[in-house]
């Protein structure tokens, strides 16, 4: 099965898959997740503050995004919006969709973490003369983010794998590069396994970074206790 020609193909194709991973998949993940954190934090704080009107809009956003497939969302933005005169290039379209999609899931993670902060923490803040915004920014949000860190890290790992869907809107990331090589070599099994191992390597690195981050946060928490 794995003859010399196939091994040669795998060795030759490796940099052709890794380079799109480093230049497209990773940047797409980093940019999208960074934006999703901004969205998620804002949406979570709106819900936590119980701002009428805005809270309902936040819940509607989360309901729609979590209730529809990511691939459908990509198609709506890239293939659907041009019919109403809104044209978005593939890479920005992928960033937009991944940010909005991940933002909905991360918003629920952060909201739950905010609600897990003891009420006494806020009361103590009021007692020393802090304003509501100061309490949120200096007391509640830092504790909530520490609690949410493991789940948010898992969301990053999931997004790395989800970026493979961007090939459906012509983003030249790893999966599209794999498909192009398969079209010339007719070796789908070996090449899909190869790109799968690259995704696995990326995910493993992120898991190690997550573990290091959790240890550092736990150490910081013990020092602050």
Feature map (PLM): residue ranges:
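Transmembrane alpha-helices and adjacent helix-loop boundaries
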Residues: 1-225
């Amino acid at each position: 099965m794995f003859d010399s020609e196939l091994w040669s193909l795998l060795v030759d194709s490796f940099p052709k898959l890794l380079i799109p991973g480093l230049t497209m998949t990773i940047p797409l993940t980093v940019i999208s997740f960074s934006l999703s954190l901004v969205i998620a934090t804002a949406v979570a704080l709106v819900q936590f503050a119980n701002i009428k009107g805005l809270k309902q809009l936040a819940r509607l956003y989360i309901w729609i995004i979590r209730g529809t497939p990511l691939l459908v969302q990509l198609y709506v933005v890239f293939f659907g919006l041009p019919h109403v005169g809104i044209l978005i290039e593939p890479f920005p379209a992928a960033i937009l969709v991944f940010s909005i999609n991940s933002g909905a899931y991360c918003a629920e993670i952060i909201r739950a973490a905010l609600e897990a902060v003891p009420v006494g923490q806020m009361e103590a803040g009021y007692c020393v003369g802090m304003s509501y915004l100061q309490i949120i920014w200096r007391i509640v949000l830092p504790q909530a983010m520490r609690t949410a860190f493991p789940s948010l890290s898992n969301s990053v790992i999931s997004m790395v794998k989800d970026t493979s869907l961007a090939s459906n809107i012509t983003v030249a990331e790893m999966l599209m590069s794999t498909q192009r090589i398969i079209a010339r070599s007719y070796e789908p099994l070996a090449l899909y396994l190869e790109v799968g191992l690259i995704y696995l390597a990326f995910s493993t690195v992120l898991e190690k970074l997550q573990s290091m981050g959790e240890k550092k946060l736990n150490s910081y928490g013990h020092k602050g206790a």
